[in-house]
Amino acid sequence: MVFLFPTGTIIIWVLTILLAVIPWYLLNKFWLKPKRFEKLLKAQGLQGDPYKLSALFMNNSKQDYILKLQQEAESKSIGLSKQAAPSIFSSHHQTVHKYGKNSFLWEGTTPSVIITDPDQIKEVFDRIYDFPKQKLRSIAKYFSFGIIKYEGEKWAKHRKIVNPAFHLDKLKGMLPAFSHSCNEMISKWKGLLSADGTCEVDVWPFLQNLTCDVISRTAFGSSYAEGEKIFQLLKKQAFLLVTTLDKNIPLSLWWLLETTTKKRMKEIERDIRESLEGIIEKREKALKNGETTNDDLLGILLQSNHAENQGHGNSKSIGMTTQEMIDECKLFYLVGQETTSTLLVWTMVLLGRYPEWQARARQEVLQVFGNQNQNFEGLSQLKIVTMILYEVLRLYPPAIYFNRALQKDLKLGNLSLPAGTLVSLPIILIHQDNDIWGDDAKEFKPERFAEGIAKATKGQVSYFPFGWGPRICIGQNFALLEAKIAITSLLQNFSFELSPNYVHVPTTVPFFQPKYGASIILHKL
């Protein structure tokens, strides 16, 4: 027997069920679940602001307020002697200051547990499959690509294919390109000198162009001109992001970003993709025809990908797709350029403020190289320069924190963390923690690295400007080698000091960099 119900009755039943389910869903999502999180975390000794029902109506209001505070702080000079964390990392800094290191804060309805214990930090970095990266907001999709966004087997595959491009023997072959770009920048600065051999210059845009030039030469080699074009497009895209943030648009309204900006970003993305597709297709065709590939990053990447496919019966499903290779090339540019340029600019700022360390570094450089070009063996002997770079990275790491998102219930040390929790590693706070580094933790003291990183950290995972463990930044040796050559070239040609016009306002959009540039007075040697 078949029972037939009037359509009106069915609709009433559906509406009744929905009216029962939806309120329960909302109550659980915006109140019961966060309160369960809070109770569980506090039972383990973690402290933080209590979750409030206002999150139901103002899910991003606190983040918007924090962003506003940071932007207000970034409009004023904080002075070189003061810690940058309170102004650029106010949410975490305020939470730790108020509740101590065993604390948490809220990102909407999600608790973010602050991890500062070196043993727990090591565990997070080691257990890469248990602690995947947090998914980024939609606006960040234009700047999240390649190996940094992948997890699990896909990450492992890409890491295996990309890794050969950054082997030390390959980096040695890139030294001439590094030196060529540095010499061009030095020549430009010499052209700005007045009759008395001095000039004042904002070095920040020059250093950005330097690292762009290096990436263009080392990543694309013979395709340098096309590489330069791609960088300019990426730069425009980054500019659109930064100017959007400067407009104080609340995080909760980013999805309403004006159509013209979104349209332009999509157009730039298409142009970048088409340009890289053209370069990659030409190189792949040459590789299939048996032609010798260029020994640049793209050439090495294509060779490695080709070898991976051949090892599995020429199955293209095993290696990277063209789109994935495009993403890796974009990553070369964005991360490679920004990481090294920020390291160089803060090194110049700090050496400009501490002339005694500048003099010691110059003496070492002249003893090793005199006025000759650099070589790999000599760069390996630069102990003082290396100490300085390590200390700059401690005080001014490229990124100021890492977030990880739990997808299942996990134990972390003595903590039991539920699925859905965020784990936050506040790099800048850990790098300047008095309990780890001593009372001078916030001071510029390169001598702390005189016996290397392991000795300075007492074997703990408390220093990780490039990350740590299996997912440590694949390009860290590239960045440090480039930085050594640039600083060496600079010290061979100039002495320098901070200009009275320099305004110390660090910002973190998109990386830890000077908001108003870096005015330096150069003196020709």
Swiss-Prot record:
Bilayer topology term: Single-pass membrane protein
Gene3D superfamilies: Cytochrome P450
Residue ranges crossing the lipid bilayer per the database entry: 2-22
Pfam families (alphabetical): p450
Keywords for the protein's UniProt record, in alphabetical order: Cholesterol metabolism, Heme, Iron, Lipid biosynthesis, Lipid metabolism, Membrane, Metal-binding, Monooxygenase, Oxidoreductase, Steroid biosynthesis, Steroid metabolism, Sterol metabolism, Transmembrane, Transmembrane helix
Keyword Aminoacyl-tRNA synthetase recorded: no
Pathway: Steroid metabolism; cholesterol metabolism
E.C. number(s) listed in UniProt: 1.14.14.-
Molecular-function annotations in GO: heme binding; iron ion binding; monooxygenase activity; oxidoreductase activity, acting on paired donors, with incorporation or reduction of molecular oxygen
GO terms under cellular component: membrane
Cell compartments where the protein resides: Membrane
Classification via PROSITE patterns: CYTOCHROME_P450
Positions that bind heme: 473
Keyword Cell membrane: no
Tissue spec: Mainly expressed in leaves and seed pods and, to a lower extent, in flowers and stems.
PANTHER family: 11-OXO-BETA-AMYRIN 30-OXIDASE, CYTOCHROME P450 FAMILY MEMBER
Function: Involved in the biosynthesis of spiroketal steroid and saponin natural products from cholesterol such as diosgenin and analogs (e.g. furostanol and spirostanol), plant defense compounds used as main precursors for the industrial production of steroid hormones. During the 5,6-spiroketalization of cholesterol, may catalyze the 27-monohydroxylation of furostanol-type steroid to an intermediate product that undergoes a stereospecific formation of the terminal heterocycle to yield diosgenin.
Family note: Belongs to the cytochrome P450 family.
Protein name: Cytochrome P450 CYP72A613
Organism the protein comes from: Trigonella foenum-graecum (Fenugreek)
